[in-house]
């Protein structure tokens, strides 16, 4: 049971107390993003957790798990609370708009880790082992898992468009990849637009559509708030082909460098780039969506990294 933003419980052991603290922390976070949960009871069951698990965390034997049990429980409960909100309160068509359910869920999971565990490594405590700590993969953060899985599937050419109806998705895309791609797409849009725009649109959609019958979708609210600034995003949801950008230095005069960035894809997208100089100092900027080629001039910086956050997989 819960009241306001507090959960009512009577911990009678250390385990119960730990769970109570975890439940309060995760519930209060979700409530801050989605508003008050208007139903008196929220059921968080082992059955629901097993039906929609945290892939990876719930499948590792305890002896080999790089995370402590408290974190695993916290992240699993967080996912259950978000899922309870989204599935119980909103008029989201679960077949047609599956990406909205899972995209919002993954977006909030990413946001939670950024807020509470920004330095958490993907391989947890194993990243400190002497035989591993100098390996490249030991530097991956926990939130890198979403783009790593996406990249693996994209490289095998079995990915599907983000907004595919649920009954058209293959098992791996249904369970893992499309939710991850959806969350990363929202993260990319949030970064591009700025001002926590996606979080604000999620909250607005939540407040306006809780426990009512409505044809309005999250994307309707998102488009209302941003208009043509997210026309590329609507197209990206339906895109079913490779994404491929390339960069080439075409001119260099003293400290002034000219780069040609080619869009070899069939879609116009904004592109995030990181510029670095000889001292490894860097700055990051966005190039507005373009479909073919664009030329940029930069002073002092002599190296460009495209798509540094890997919001989408490239060939």
PLM region spans:
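Coil residues (strongly favoring Ser/Thr
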Residues: 13-16, 168, 294
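Surface-exposed patches in mature extracellular/periplasmic domains of secreted proteins
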Residues: 39-45, 95-96, 119-124, 200-202, ...
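Glycine/proline-rich low-complexity spacer/linker segments in large multi-domain proteins
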Residues: 312-315
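Acidic/His/Gly-enriched intrinsically disordered linker/tail segments
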Residues: 70, 96, 102-184
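Juxtacatalytic substrate-recognition/specificity segment
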Residues: 2-98, 104-112
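A generic secondary-structure signal for well-formed alpha-helical elements
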Residues: 34-38, 84-89, 108-120, 193-197, ...
């Amino acid at each position: 049971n819960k009241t306001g933003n507090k959960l009512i419980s009577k911990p009678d052991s250390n385990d119960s107390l730990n769970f109570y603290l975890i439940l309060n922390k995760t519930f209060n976070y979700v409530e801050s993003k989605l508003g008050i949960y208007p139903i008196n009871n929220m059921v968080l069951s082992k059955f629901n957790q097993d039906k929609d698990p945290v892939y990876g965390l719930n499948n590792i034997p305890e002896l080999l798990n790089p995370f402590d049990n408290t974190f695993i429980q916290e992240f699993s409960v967080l996912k259950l609370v978000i899922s309870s909100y989204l599935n119980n309160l909103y008029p989201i068509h679960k077949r047609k708009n599956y990406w909205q359910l899972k995209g919002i869920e993954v977006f909030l999971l990413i946001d939670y880790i950024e807020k509470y565990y920004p330095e958490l490594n993907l391989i947890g405590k194993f990243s400190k082992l002497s035989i591993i700590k100098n390996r490249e993969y030991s530097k991956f953060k926990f939130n890198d898992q979403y783009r790593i899985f996406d990249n693996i599937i994209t490289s095998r050419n079995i990915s599907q468009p983000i907004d595919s109806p649920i009954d058209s998705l293959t098992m791996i895309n249904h369970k893992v990849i499309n939710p991850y791609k959806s969350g990363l797409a929202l993260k990319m849009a949030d970064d591009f637009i700025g001002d926590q725009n996606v979080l604000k649109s999620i909250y607005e959609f939540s407040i306006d559509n809780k426990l009512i019958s409505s044809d309005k979708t999250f994307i309707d609210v998102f488009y209302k708030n941003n208009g043509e600034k997210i026309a590329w995003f609507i197209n990206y949801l339906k895109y079913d082909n490779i994404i491929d950008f390339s960069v080439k230095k075409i001119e260099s005069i003293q400290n002034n460098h000219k780069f040609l960035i080619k869009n070899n894809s069939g879609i116009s997208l904004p592109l995030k780039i990181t510029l670095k100089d000889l001292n490894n100092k860097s700055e990051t900027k966005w190039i507005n969506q373009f479909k073919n080629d664009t030329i940029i001039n930069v002073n002092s910086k002599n190296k460009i990294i495209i798509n540094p956050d890997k919001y989408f997989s490239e060939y």
